[in-house]
């Protein structure tokens, strides 16, 4: 019997989710046995992970701010060019008569 596209889609999603879960296991699940074995090392790893997350967030914020600044500069340049073109057109119309 033929499987419906919906069922095929569900199976693909299931296997895709399982593959991602196996490739990137839950950090909390990995940290629990490590915390029992060596609490100091587990705490240091948690601090390092938090620091890397903070650094990634800061980098993303800086990138967003740079993009916003570039977009603002581009919009200002376009507005200035449009204003200059309108002024030149008005001057030409005045000179014609």
From Swiss-Prot:
Compartments where found: Secreted
Primary subcellular site in the record, as a coarse category: secreted
One Gene Ontology term, aspect cellular component: extracellular region
Secreted in keyword set: yes
GO molecular function annotation: antifreeze activity
Signal sequence range: 1-23
Propeptide: 24-48
Tissue distribution of the protein: Detected in blood serum (at protein level).
Keywords, ordered alphabetically: Antifreeze protein, Repeat, Secreted, Signal
Free-text function comment from the UniProt entry: Contributes to protect fish blood from freezing at subzero sea water temperatures. Lowers the blood freezing point. Binds to nascent ice crystals and prevents further growth.
Similarity section: Belongs to the type-I AFP family.
Name used for this protein in its record: Ice-structuring protein
